[in-house]
């Protein structure tokens, strides 16, 4: 191997004239080796400015490499600078593992290495890897320039590269590319804050000409796909991975962000805008202002910044994303006071919103559909998991803990978040544990454990209909265990509620609950069930045994009353002709009786009528047919229907 010898005196002179006091380089040469490690070409390096020899090496690879002849450019150990952007070549490895550091010293908005421009689709740079070494900036470079920009590429990898000392810019930008991987890289140090920059270290961006990704034609609506960021470390920067930019109706697809570590970020660790089929898993996020943001459309105030590409985009109906097995610790800051560990956002863009914010976003509901959030461990000073306009999704098996019992929500579903399953989560402290708000309907809240909230454990706000709260454990709430606002709630069943300082279950005025049944009450400050004036409910049998008052309470316009369980009627059935007479003894406290019938003993029983007496006649039955009956004792007062369990089945053949 050919070596270029530089005298000691010349080396000293070069160090004094060309380098800062902390910069050194090793004289030698850039080698280009083939897949057998045979050196096929060399380019001398005799100055700290490596721009020209690296360009020559890349040009050589551009002419001589192929899919069957991968060439590797090996940079010798040392600290070098780049003063003009170099263009990467396909089927090439840039190897910095011998200890090379390359610093961006471009006088303008230049970069260390970019993909070539002037391509469509993914037909530009192919099969290019940067391996090892350090990439950063000289102390004098304050040009807010990215270190590397990749577009229209297929098969680009950054392996074990350390990126350092950013200045109000991304470290790497990727747009309109596929099969891009960042593996084992480190991103450390950044000058700037949220007031001057929200830059992600790795920006997985849109290919938009004027504001976001200039200089990389052709702008053909090519979106990123199959981008992976794994095993990387992000420390002491603003934001980690993602983008805040999006086109209406176009989506970045198959984005994987896994097994990374984010520490001491003043912004958001992972920020996804318009991403579909994402795998966000196994990440450790510590002492960051926000954890994971997932936006299908921007919020109202930011609709004006939605970008336009053409009129061919369509609204996504299945985001297909999973956020799981992440460990997240977030601390709210002055800039992000409503910080969330996980924040999911869809938006229904109406014509009035479109006009008001002069937005390119097409009119339509950009809801988040089919996202799964599970097995995450969260500690936060603000919110745990917040979802807006999120539909047909699952939030389950998360452990969500607040450092305080005032302010913030453990799990919050709002803005028409409908038909979601929220189950098997463990929630500690917060103001409210689980809150359903803003016209969110048909959600199932089941088998969650909520402990130590400052206000209520589980809350259904006014206007949120057809939600069910079943089989949850709610402990030590500062106010109510379960609070129902002015909404039509399907059921509150089989919950274990203990040590609420106010009521176990509290119904506000105009609340309407179809079923309150099978709940276990233990030691409450006031009532097991409190029904405010104007509320309505069907209250079946509950376990009041260990409740402080051992009863419920109904507030009325003229009279209040207490209630507990009604006894079950003992039923007999007789017949005369085609009439069956169902009879029972009076049940104490009941003022009405509901009768149900089936033509099969173990079949479905349908309501056939009610009576205030102790006898009910069922007429005009078919001869030779057997009819089966059940009866429930009922007390109706102040809009509350207190019901006993159904009686034992009794039948009669006509």
Predicted segments, located by residue:
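Acidic Gly/Asp/Thr-rich repetitive segments characteristic of extracellular carbohydrate-active
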Residues: 39-74
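Short, T/G/N/S-enriched strand-turn elements that build extracellular solenoid repeat scaffolds
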Residues: 55-63, 81-89, 105, 118-120, ...
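N-terminal extracellular ligand-recognition/capping segment immediately after the signal peptide
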Residues: 58, 67-116, 135, 139, ...
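Short glycine/acidic-rich loop motifs that flank beta-strands on beta-rich extracellular proteins
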Residues: 82-85, 103-110, 135-147, 167-173, ...
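Right-handed parallel beta-helix
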Residues: 122-125, 129-269, 277
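Consensus "Asn ladder" position of solenoid repeat domains
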Residues: 133, 161, 185, 232, ...
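Pro/Thr/Ser/Gly-rich low-complexity, intrinsically disordered linker/stalk tracts
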Residues: 563-589, 623, 640-654
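Beta-strand-rich modules
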Residues: 618-639
